[in-house]
């Protein structure tokens, strides 16, 4: 089983915190879609004929695509790859794009999961972040998706936002819970160098949330969502029982995936590769029958580190027998040795051959993971 990620880089405007590759050159959509479909064909052997269990259209803003453009992509996917009948197929969307008419169109396509970038329900903060939607548009978009028959809806939230308090965060969480999405992702705001948000902080126009507040917000996130019946299955992800993101979970469990489009990453079990982060260079290289990318062959230590980073973040934890059989006795013993002080402190535990974070360990997961890495 494997997954496919499709990068749709087009945005009407750029959010001030975003450092993903995106562009506002919507006039190049047609040329891009054509190049993307060519890449899907050029790389049809990358996954060695494995069935496709998940497809994820991310961005950028995939909901900027028209019916014709989406149909072209899905036609290529289904003609070239063996997509399973029960595949999870996700489209990332901005709430203001999700009009009843657009949602009705999406229902005619193989898409069965909507991932909506809401971020917050605070109007002034939405404006500061350069989000295009209002809180009411976000609420209505979820309701319209539900009315149209979508039974798997995910929403993204952010915390640690400028001006945020515990009270406004609780308001956001209560509003999110009231919408009853199947899945909620919640990420702490990161001030990425080079973004407009970074520059605002450097100019003292916004203030970063302090560590104590950030911990309180994260703790409140866990308490509110678990109380509402959501499973905390990965550091930043929550779902109703059985409705975890199958696509993202495939990353965390080390499955192969193909990434197509500018800046997209791929993994085949032994190497990582990533496409050029330029729309023009990407299209030009495809037109010349080539692909502009870089590749990194992964030695056993790098693969071990990736295994640690991805598995420890989940509630499934790390299978010690899998660690031993795949990475050998030396790395198995190394991991146990590095885990010992954390086991003694009660922030890691071993249950039924699985090494995992305890509830206390979740709050210091980055430090624990860092200690387990082979350096």
Can you annotate each of these PLM segments?
Residues 1-8:
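Immediate flanking context of iron-sulfur cluster ligation sites
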Residues 1, 22-45, 50-329:
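C-terminal scaffold of the Radical SAM
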Residues 362-375:
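Short, amphipathic alpha-helical interaction segments positioned at domain boundaries
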């Amino acid at each position: 089983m494997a997954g496919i990620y499709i990068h749709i880089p087009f945005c009407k405007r750029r959010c001030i915190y975003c450092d993903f590759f995106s562009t506002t050159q919507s006039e190049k959509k047609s040329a891009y879609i054509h190049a993307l479909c060519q890449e899907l064909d050029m790389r049809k052997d990358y996954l060695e004929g494995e069935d496709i269990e998940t497809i994820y259209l991310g961005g950028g803003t995939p909901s900027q695509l028209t019916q014709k453009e989406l149909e072209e992509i899905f036609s290529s996917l289904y003609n070239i790859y063996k997509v399973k009948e029960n595949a999870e197929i996700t489209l990332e969307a901005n709430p203001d794009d999700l009009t009843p008419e657009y949602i009705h169109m999406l229902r005619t396509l193989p898409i069965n999961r909507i991932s909506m970038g809401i971020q917050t329900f605070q109007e002034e903060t939405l404006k500061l972040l350069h989000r295009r939607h209002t809180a009411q548009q976000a609420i209505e978009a979820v309701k319209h998706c539900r009315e149209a028959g979508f039974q798997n809806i995910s929403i993204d939230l952010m915390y640690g936002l400028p001006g945020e308090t515990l009270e406004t965060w609780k308001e956001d969480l209560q509003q999110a819970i009231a919408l009853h999405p199947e899945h909620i992702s919640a990420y702490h705001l990161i001030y990425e160098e080079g973004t407009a948000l970074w520059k605002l902080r450097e100019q003292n126009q916004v203030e970063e949330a302090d560590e104590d507040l950030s911990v309180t917000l994260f703790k409140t996130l866990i308490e509110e969502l678990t109380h509402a019946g959501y499973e905390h299955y990965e550091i930043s992800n929550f779902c109703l029982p059985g409705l975890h993101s199958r696509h993202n979970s495939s990353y965390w469990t080390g499955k192969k995936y193909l990434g197509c489009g500018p800046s997209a990453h791929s993994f085949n079990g032994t190497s990582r590769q990533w496409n050029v982060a330029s729309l023009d260079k990407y299209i030009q290289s495809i037109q010349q029958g080539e692909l502009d990318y870089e590749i990194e062959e992964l030695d056993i230590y790098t693969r071990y580190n990736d295994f640690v980073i991805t598995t420890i973040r989940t509630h499934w934890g790390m299978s010690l027998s899998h660690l031993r059989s795949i990475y050998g006795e030396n790395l198995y013993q190394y991991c146990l040795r590095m885990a010992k002080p954390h086991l003694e402190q009660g922030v890691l535990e071993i249950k039924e051959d699985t090494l995992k974070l305890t509830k206390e360990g979740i709050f210091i997961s980055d430090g624990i993971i860092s200690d387990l890495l082979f350096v």
